[in-house]
Amino acid sequence: MEGLVQMFQKKIKVPKLLAVLVIISTHTFANESFEGQSGEIISIPAAIQKQADDLTFKTSEGIKQLVSLPFVKQDLVITRHHVDVKVNWVNFGESRITIADESKVTLSKENQARANKEGAEIKMALSNSTKEITPSFNFIAPVPGIVTSPFGKQRFVNGLPRSAHLALDLRGAVGTPIVAPLKGKVVLIGDYFYTGLTLILDHGHGLFSSYAHMSEIKVKLGDLVEQSGEIGLVGATGRVTGPHLHWTVYFDGNKVNPESLIQAGYLNSIL
């Protein structure tokens, strides 16, 4: 009998380590339920076969990773990374603004071509995030002003429906200093049709933030800015109705609600 077992093992030749990996990789999260609100970040158990440089967090419940949930217009179940997540619709309300310059509402072919080109530049800047910075997710507000237009509102410009407002507008007079809410590297500076003087910071591991309508930019492309370091001044450039900071945060491929990120103890609240 012992001889037969040895002969069988020689024919199969399955390395013990491979066998263990096969068993581990069959683990699923079928018995676990995950859900969150539109435009928010949640935590899920880290993937078993994660990359060495993946951003993970040790908790009392095990190793977790963060995932972003997209803005949705109805409850939706989606797959994020290796789990299914229910994204709950949120009624963020609506915003109606009037822009006197009709050329900035109904774009000419030239302006549309410019806007498309600039959109591609922004998309390119967001396509590759550094792993040399590890974000703490302990954000501070970039300006002290109150929120004038929150995340998620359905916008109407001159009575016409437009895309939802997936950013946070903060009040500020022209010249008000804007600071980095988190350590980051300057990966884009531009003067764009919609957003005027614009700056993007890469905070590492797929976390970016954008600052629009600035009157002046105080940093250079490639600069590494520490948290609370000044990056520019509030302005009214681009398509605006008045001076303010238009602050957008991107994580894990989605625009997320910046107002949530500046709450005290934010990271611990989602782990």
Language model regions located:
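Non-catalytic extracellular/periplasmic "stalk"
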Residues: 31-146, 150
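Sec-dependent signal peptide recognition
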Residues: 13-20
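Catalytic cores of peptidoglycan-degrading enzymes
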Residues: 140-271
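Sterically constrained small-residue positions within well-ordered secondary structures
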Residues: 21, 33-35, 48, 69, ...
